[in-house]
Amino acid sequence: MAPWPELGDAQPNPDKYLEGAAGQQPTAPDKSKETNKNNTEAPVTKIELLPTYSTATLIDEPTEVDDPWNIPTLQDSGIKWSERDTKGKILCVFQGIGRLILLLGFLYFFVCSLDILSSAFQLVGGKMAGQFFSNSSIMSNPLLGLVIGVLVTVLVQSSSTSTSIVVSMVSSSLLTVRAAIPIIMGANIGTSITNTIVALMQVGDRSEFRRAFAGATVHDFFNWLSVLVLLPVEVATHYLEIITQLIVDSFHSKNGEDAPDLLKVITKPFTKLIVQLDKKIISQIAMNDEKAKNKSLVKIWCKTFTNKTQVNVTVPSTANCTSPSLCWTDGIQTWTMKNVTYKENIAKCQHIFVNFHLPDLAVGTILLILSLLVLCGCLIMIVKILGSVLKGQVATVIKKTINTDFPFPFAWLTGYLAILVGAGMTFIVQSSSVFTSALTPLIGIGVITIERAYPLTLGSNIGTTTTAILAALASPGNALRSSLQIALCHFFFNISGILLWYPIPFTRLPIRMAKGLGNISAKYRWFAVFYLIIFFFLIPLTVFGLSLAGWRVLVGVGVPVVFIIILVLCLRLLQSRCPRVLPKKLQNWNFLPLWMRSLKPWDAVFSKFTGCFQMRCCCCCRVCCRACCLLCGCPKCCRCSKCCEDLEEAHEGQDVPVKAPDTFDNITISREAQGEVPASDSKTECTAL
């Protein structure tokens, strides 16, 4: 319910309205005359109106504004179980089973679409990501390493891929562990873009989008804040490198078995039918293999046979022969026998693009569009199914189970249990992106609060590192130490971040920052896309370019920018906490132009560009909804056209000045209630006022 508008001349005391009102009451003319005659002799009689007709009651007791971050109550408008007959109960059971099957099916395709989305990004930008790593000389700069880790992980949509590239480079002595640590930190930031993209799919409902986007970006802010604090500490002390080196030196482990595939056992059979990639090519490009640059990432041959044979080859002289017995010469040329290894292709892979012979960019673009469409469709259906299931008593039980703390004095343990649950679930699905992306719609519809989602997200950061540690233990001997040390660096980095931003409640800044961004994005929804472009592309690319130009350029540009940001933050803190210490002009931002202190002018600009597209989108939504209504027979399923309702609210909900009602308004309302004044006349009088 929308809050009451502020009244310009509201009087908190109802006596000021009701004094002398009896003189104008038509139902008691005699009493009013006597009251007017004795006005100077006796006190004025006050008439108490019913709360239904009294505007003074509305002024004195305003309705409390609902907190947008409160979990919404999903009312169950269906027929109660006790009121159903036998046929209705059986039908209800089958409907529940059908919804569960549909939910699991859409969740399966949702996870598969995330896997294909990662493959699409690797096809589009995988070779470029490998070229970022190919220049190992620039990797010694920690800031450049951080930015490269962010950009590469955003391009390939997989922190596991970027981490495996780093491991292969470290094991090949192309990169040191010290230079690899900032890249791992950047990969931790880049992997959080996936669930932020998923949150954009709930943009149709402002309330859901506010919660979903805040729940997704709490992961971003945790990673950014952790890097801002821990990267300088690591550069100064190298504590991650030292701790992990001691742990690795204490191990005397041999090569283990491969890391267990849990969720991938279910999803691989389907995703392999869509596309299969040769991910070794990206690592080969990173290690400056020129032949790999001309190879396609799309895997064509799945079954090959490697054979060795002896062939005659020409050598410059007899000194190059393999042995004297295998060396022949005619005085002009010299031959010898050499063992040559060749690969023989036996069977092709079984996927859609195996015989298309399209370039990687074309295949990646096709898969990117299709995977985003499937991702959006699955997410919409998951939200709708959950919204239809999580109602009434079921919703109450689930919300209380997830969001309720342990009884005192063990309430503080609840968050740490949530961290363990998040780590365990991420270990099962073997991807933090999959877990946090599945968490996002639940936050949007109000099943999980932001405060509970935060420790679950922190646990997912821990869970993805345990998977990397198991994978490192299964590495071959030449890569075991380096891969294990890098996986442990990733693990202790996330542990350090949790110690910084979770144990003490007032240090949980990511929650407050995510809520602030959620409020802004709910009001100006274009700002969510702006945030993604700025934080995951423009800022890393700008820092990358300035770093390549030299440290003098980086310092000359970066120091003033950092100084301005710190100054603005300090001013904002003083304005909110103790504004009296500031000059009057600096107690607010009104001294700045409107476009520098408000998003309203920018919103007007973006609205002009997006207005036409939004209207066309709404028309398509209405057509699709009506077709859906015809199929399912439900007259209320057109709620998916909420963008149209938002447009109508935007046009109708303009700021109209509302004045406090005078005594005459009370009289008019009472006359209308008694039937003496027609409703149309009263509306005309109110309009004239």
Swiss-Prot record:
Domain of life: Eukaryota
Protein name: Sodium-dependent phosphate transport protein 2B
Pfam families: Na_Pi_cotrans (PF02690)
GO molecular function per UniProt: phosphate ion binding; sodium ion binding; sodium:phosphate symporter activity
Annotated membrane topology: Multi-pass membrane protein
Side Extracellular, residues: 122-135, 234-362, 429-485, 547-552
Membrane-spanning intervals of the chain: 101-121, 136-156, 213-233, 363-383, 408-428, 486-506, 526-546, 553-573
Subcellular location: Apical cell membrane
GO CC field: apical plasma membrane; brush border; membrane; vesicle
Described purpose of this protein according to its UniProt entry: Involved in actively transporting phosphate into cells via Na(+) cotransport.
Species of the source: Pongo abelii
Keywords: Cell membrane, Disulfide bond, Glycoprotein, Ion transport, Membrane, Sodium, Sodium transport, Symport, Transmembrane, Transmembrane helix, Transport
Glycosylation sites recorded in the entry for this protein: 294, 307, 320
Covalent S-S links between cysteines: 302-349
Example GO biological process: intracellular phosphate ion homeostasis
